[in-house]
Curated annotation (Swiss-Prot):
Family: Belongs to the methyltransferase superfamily.
Cellular component GO terms held in the UniProt record: extracellular region
Biological process, per Gene Ontology: methylation
Keyword Phosphoprotein (UniProt): no
UniProt-recorded name of the protein: Probable methyltransferase-like protein 24
Function: Probable methyltransferase.
Biased composition (Basic residues): 63-79
Compartments (UniProt record): Secreted
InterPro entries, alphabetized: Methyltranfer_dom, METTL24
GO MF: methyltransferase activity
Signal sequence extent: 1-38
Lineage top rank: taxon: Eukaryota
Length: 363
């Protein structure tokens, strides 16, 4: 006896099977499309941010700062890749440091009280000239030519203190001394050459140097850079990425130098604003000794105000040095220069003095 199938069962199984297969196929296609979307973008995709290609020295880390010295060559230190021999295991003279210094929190120095109730030029000049003519600490061993013996006298008394208690002599003997010399077209390099011969790493900054960085002899570098109290405006710096004007703190960052044993400066009346910048940005903490030539025949670049106010500003800067533990150990009055004080023949003053300070907290 024949059996009768319920209506609709045989025909309904096929559509459900096809529906399941189609669903599985769809899920697989979605997964493949999603995986393909994570790959490189197509030509029509919007590009990412542009990449900046920076010039860096051989061996410098990726992502190094834009403004950095692009050489590591020195006569007595490690030479760059690609040839040359090394005569010392010490690091290269201007290694890529990329230091990030904390800037000072002040915008202005603290002005000292007026010298007298009348706020006159006579009162201010008398106090200032007495201050720069009186040493504050004794130095038993002063030298113009490092520890080397040299019979030729230095044209100017650029004196450093070589007492063992201040550490410079030890740094020279151990060949770890570093000197920065700031100038404007001076041909007098006796002091720099002598310190280099004595074992110091010397960097002379002068915008009149023909090449960007020149190694004259072992340990003596010349850089076509001018030290200013401000960095160039960012718009100007972008147009001239290799501009030759920079603050001293910026130079230290670019060269990767943490400390300067001696800072010598002959800046032809720019010294007052440069010194102010060193104070406000706490760069003085990185300096062991200062040897500055100061000029008194006019206020100096971007120093304004009444005559008595200008002298008060000068005096306040030097008192800031004292607060930073710098003590005057030598003073020299240049009698070969015009005897002028703010364009006047007054107070028996010279227009030019050379002053030497030592940082008593230097380690």
């Amino acid at each position: 006896m024949a059996t009768v199938k319920p209506p609709g069962r045989g025909c309904g199984a096929l559509p459900r099977w096809l529906l399941g297969a189609a669903l599985l196929l769809g899920l697989r296609l979605c997964m493949e499309l999603r995986h393909a979307g994570s790959g490189p973008p197509g030509r029509g995709d919007s590009p990412g941010p542009p990449r900046t290609h920076l010039l860096s020295a051989p061996g410098s880390p990726r992502g190094a700062r834009r403004r950095q010295v692009t050489y590591v060559r020195s006569g007595r230190r490690v030479l760059p890749r690609g040839g040359g021999s090394t005569t010392s295991p010490e690091p290269s003279c201007c290694a890529q440091g990329g230091l990030l210094r904390r800037k000072g929190s002040r915008w202005h120095i603290e002005l000292q009280p007026w010298a007298g109730p009348s706020r006159s030029l006579d009162e201010e000049a008398s106090r200032f000239l007495s201050y720069i003519s009186t040493t504050q600490i004794a130095c038993d061993h002063m030298g113009t030519d490092s520890l080397a013996t040299d019979s030729s006298p230095a044209p100017k008394p650029w004196l450093v203190c070589l007492d063992d208690r201040f550490g410079l002599a030890h740094q020279i003997r151990s060949k770890r001394c570093r000197l920065y010399s700031l100038g404007l077209g001076s041909d007098d390099t006796h002091f720099e050459v002598s310190m280099a011969n004595g074992g110091c790493e010397v960097h002379r900054f002068d915008p009149s140097v023909k090449s960007a960085h020149v190694l004259e002899r072992q340990g003596l570098w010349h850089h076509r850079l001018s030290i200013d109290w401000r960095d160039p405006h960012p718009a100007v710096a972008a147009q001239k990425p290799h501009g030759n004007t920079r603050k001293l703190g910026s130079i230290l960052n670019e060269f990767g130098h943490h400390k300067i044993d001696v800072l010598k400066a002959d800046l032809e009346s720019a010294e007052w604003k440069v010194l102010e910048n060193l104070i406000l940005e706490d760069v003085l903490e990185q300096i062991g000794q200062l040897v500055f030539e100061i000029h008194l025949h006019w206020p100096g670049f971007e120093v304004s105000g009444s005559e008595s106010g200008v002298v008060r500003f000068w005096y306040s800067l030097l008192k800031e040095l004292e607060r930073k533990h710098f003590r005057l150990f030598h003073t020299y009055k240049d009698l070969t220069k015009p005897q002028l004080f703010l364009k006047k023949d007054l107070f028996n003053a010279s227009s030019c003095y050379t002053l030497s300070w030592v940082n008593t907290k230097w380690r």
